[in-house]
Curated annotation (Swiss-Prot):
This is Diaminopimelate epimerase. HAMAP family: DAP_epimerase. Its EC number is 5.1.1.7. It is found in: Cytoplasm. The gene is dapF. It comes from Nitrobacter hamburgensis (strain DSM 10229 / NCIMB 13809 / X14).
Length: 290
């Protein structure tokens, strides 16, 4: 029947990024890829990422957070999802600051500069080709050789690549809506240059403090927002000296503020986390789960 049958959940969103939060700290158990897919199946709870809180493994942390995409694959990081998790735990505990463990490492969260906003310290970006990772060596990952379309007239080319705990490729364009990301996204996500697949972003630098973007998420497809992609894009633009270290990011679902902090290289993401409804998983969803 599976771990999640009859278990409570919260449906939330981070600027349109559809999030389901499940707290298993009082019932430690692993969630399988099959269960994660079942949650998003017809009759279930549609989501982009499933955030599962499990008992803390390290002192001083609230939980180990496992993150699943709607195809059942695990993600190392999800900034929008972490804001949703943070809101739920803030409201339950009344604490001023929280630390969670994820596959990407420790993430600290605190109340944002205004009511309803939450900040997540996403840690430092990584630029080495092995760290992203890429399948072959590139000494300079500010741009890599990768294109879509004819050699002499590519539609997209020369993306910047960054790891924010998960791999990102950012293509710089004049208009993020002028390209068929729904078509190119899955092809680029699964390109051989990305051995762990990649999140694919189209970004337009509208000013030194404003970037417009759309993302095809690895394992989730087109989403209204991707927090780690916003972080990666802001960092990549600053690295090219085309944007400042504090940038407003404009995504289809809303806005985020990203700061690439100079003193320690950490990337801070600030934005809302919206509670939609609470429920209990229907056991019928997991009838075929071993």
């Amino acid at each position: 029947m599976g771990t999640l049958a009859n278990h409570a959940f919260s449906k939330m969103n981070g600027i349109g990024n559809e999030i389901v939060v499940v707290d298993l700290r009082d019932r430690p158990a692993a969630v399988t890829a099959e269960e994660a897919r079942a949650v998003a199946s017809p009759g279930g709870v549609p989501y982009d990422q499933l955030m599962v809180l499990q008992p803390p493994r390290l002192p001083g942390t609230e939980a180990f957070v496992s993150i699943y995409n709607n195809d059942g694959s695990e993600a190392n990081a999800c900034g929008n999802g972490m804001r949703c998790v943070a809101r739920q735990v803030f409201e339950a505990t009344g604490k001023a600051a929280l630390t969670f463990e994820t596959r990407a490492g420790l993430l600290s969260c605190w109340q944002g500069p205004a009511p309803g906003l939450y900040t997540v310290d996403m840690g430092p970006p990584k630029f080495g080709w092995r760290d992203i990772p890429l399948a072959e060596e590139f000494r300079d990952t500010r741009y890599i050789e990768l294109q879509v379309g004819p050699i002499d007239a590519p539609v997209l080319h020369s993306p910047s690549v960054v790891s924010m705990g998960n791999p990102h490729a950012i293509f710089w364009v004049d208009d993020v809506n002028a390209h068929d990301l729904e078509r190119f996204g899955p092809l680029l996500e699964n390109h051989p240059i990305f051995p762990e697949r990649a999140n694919i972003t189209l970004a337009h630098i509208a000013g030194r403090d404003r970037i417009v973007m759309r993302t095809w998420e690895r394992g989730a497809g087109m989403t209204k927002a991707c927090g780690s992609a916003a972080c990666a894009t802001a960092v990549a633009a600053a690295r090219l000296k085309r944007a400042d270290r504090v940038v407003d990011m404009v995504l289809p679902g809303g806005g985020l503020t990203i700061e690439w902090r100079e003193r320690d290289d950490h990337v801070l993401m600030t934005g809302p986390a919206v509670f939609e409804y609470a429920g209990t998983f229907d056991p019928a969803l997991f009838a075929s789960v071993a």
